[in-house]
Amino acid sequence: MNTVDVAVVGAGPTGLMLACELAMRGVRVRVLEERDDLPNITRAFGLHARTLELLDARDMADEIVERGVPVREVAPAPGATLNLRELPTRYPMVLIAPQSLTERVLSARASQLGVDIAHGQKVVGLEQDHEGVTLRLADGSTQRAGYVVGCDGARSAVRTLLGIDFVGKQYETHILLADVRLARPPSDGLSAKTSADGVVLLVPFGDGWFRAIAWDRTREQAPLSEPVTLSEIRAAFLRIAHTDFGMADMRWSSRFLSERRQAKRYRVGRVFIAGDAAHVHSPLGAQGMNTGIQDAMNLGWKLAQAVGGFAQPWVLDSYEEERHAVGANVLKLTDGFNQLVLGRSLLRRALRRVVITVLLNVPATRHMLEGRLSGIGIRYPRPRGAHPLTGRRMPDIDCSGTRLYELMRDGRFTVVTSDKVDIGRSDVTVAVHVDPGLPAAVLVRPDGYVAWAGERAELAAVVGHWCGERQPSTNPTY
């Protein structure tokens, strides 16, 4: 029987990111993917600032940013604009980049790290005991692993086999998707139009193709199995935007109903779920791929500690505690966007737009929404009495001639102090940054969030609490 430390089910962005996070720490990982190959066409296309920061912290952002199309403003309602340039980050934007590009970059990194990605492997059974998990595959073979993570999408086999409830609802509004070429493309990048008949959106991929998205109320009774034609998508744009922008070729199309659901649990014993297997929602706000990648970043270092034998039980428990709350907030955010844009009552939609326009003219409210949309504002729970920085995203500060996120690319914990200090460990990076506004010492988790902040005298105990027993000394100092 083939045995690995962790079996990841699903080779989408969540599964690939998780595999990279595990393999870079020496964990034996195998990815089981039901599809025979990675697709070139996909529904997701937006990467937000926090996701780009995390990719940067693993040296995978540059290629995606170079090939993507930056969007610096988002208008959730007419007259209400979120200026993403205000975000305190190196990536003040939402980057239009097809999921297929992100998957190719992640897949290449996984291959460099020696990850075994097995295609055509469908999971049909799961059993676990106190030592590990056995997966049964459709071809009759089995896969044994210390831990299993289901990153296998909204119809997750892993979640189903665990018996985890996927609570929520299906939206009633049909969504039409098509990748098209335009003879008269809009000049304003991301282009959205609304009317009483629905909403249309054009997303530039930067290679001559555009993603055309339509919520057309006149076509809500069309069967989901009915193919989307070029004439149908053109008619929707003409009816709602009064132009079809000269739509010509169409290489792909789809019709679907989106859902708003979240798994009640993200873990059962040695088995976890992440990404769309744990949460699905309206595509408005472009949160899905981002939330999944961030799930993987949160879980990866924790699982690696468990495999290494020095993770205390609370470390693995914290994955569900932290990410379930984030997933619930994402569902609330996207459901709000859905009601604002696609609600059936014209009066209610109009009232919501008036309210959101007024609220976004209040700087504090606007910055809060920008933080939620971009992921910059995510904060994990902090213990009572902990420093206010605890649980917050650590900014990409300058550290001795380089950047913090560059120092984090080996996936270790990082101690940020105002002066050089030897903490006697090789598995923790020490970075020097002088800032009167920061505490004397800050311990940054591998996923870029503050684990602890306080006085240097407490460092040894704190590092031992988070990282396990002491390792041989030779930790680099920058």
Placement of each model-derived feature along the sequence:
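Short, glycine-anchored, charge-dense loop/turn motifs used at functional sites
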Residues: 278, 441-451
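Short loop/turn microsegments at loop-to-beta-strand junctions
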Residues: 269, 438-440
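Core Rossmann-like FAD-binding/catalytic domain of the broad FAD-dependent monooxygenase superfamily
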Residues: 1-350, 356-360, 368, 477-478
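Short, hydrophobic beta-strand segments that form beta-sheet elements in well-ordered domains
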Residues: 176-179, 413-419, 429-433
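C-terminal helical "tail/cap" subdomain of flavin- and related membrane-associated enzymes
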Residues: 302-413, 417-423, 439, 451-457, ...
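Short, internal strand/loop/helix patches
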Residues: 149, 424-438
